[in-house]
């Protein structure tokens, strides 16, 4: 980041956060999007928004257009290795805090364990609450298809990151073969 875009970034006013973000994004495109490059852009982007907010004496929500009262939020955690009891206690805690949407991690070595966990959480949530799962890119296309078919009975809003994000053909295949809504 420093070698490629700092001179041009310094030439732009820090209030132009969006332009600066686009500039940084353009300068790193040849090394790939994601990974450490996107982390560096994110860190600078956050700092620029912070500077802008402090100079304007405004919160980020105000700079983004004001507080919205209709935004839905869900809760989730890094729970892949939790015992079933701990997982369900976490989900109960989310519900007690007023969340009506929950996302859990899947991608255990044994699909049967994932199915048991998804089934137990869906039972706890009931049909009135939204439910999503996230595999954090842990599956092959074939594993994701098998998993999506197994999870289809649990009324999931989406299946997030079943495979690596750049495999567009794989996402298309999972979607067409299972009908499962996917999130990348």
Tell me what each language-model feature is.
Residues 1-131, 136-138, 142-145, 149-153, ...:
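N-terminal capping/lid subdomain adjacent to the active-site entrance of alpha/beta enzymes
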Residues 138, 164-168:
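Short acidic loop-to-helix transition motifs that present clustered carboxylates
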Residues 173-175:
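C-terminal helical cap(s) of enzyme catalytic domains, especially alpha/beta-barrels
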């Amino acid at each position: 980041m420093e070698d490629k875009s700092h001179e041009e970034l310094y030439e732009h006013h820090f209030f132009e956060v969006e332009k600066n973000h686009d500039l940084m994004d353009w300068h790193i495109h040849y090394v790939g999007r994601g990974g450490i490059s996107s982390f560096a852009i994110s860190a600078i982007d956050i700092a620029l928004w912070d500077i802008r907010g402090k100079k304007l004496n405004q919160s980020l929500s105000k700079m983004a257009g004001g507080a919205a009262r209709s935004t839905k939020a869900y809760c989730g955690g890094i729970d892949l290795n939790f015992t079933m009891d701990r997982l369900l206690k976490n989900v109960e805690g989310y519900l007690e805090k007023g969340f009506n949407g929950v996302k859990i991690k899947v991608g255990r070595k044994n699909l049967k364990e994932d199915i048991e966990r998804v089934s137990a959480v869906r039972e706890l949530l009931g049909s009135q609450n939204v439910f999503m799962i996230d595999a954090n890119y842990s599956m092959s296309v074939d594993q994701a298809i098998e998993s999506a078919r197994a999870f289809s009975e649990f009324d999931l809003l989406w299946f997030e990151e079943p495979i690596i994000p750049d495999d567009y053909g794989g996402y298309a295949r999972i979607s067409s073969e299972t009908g499962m809504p996917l999130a990348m």
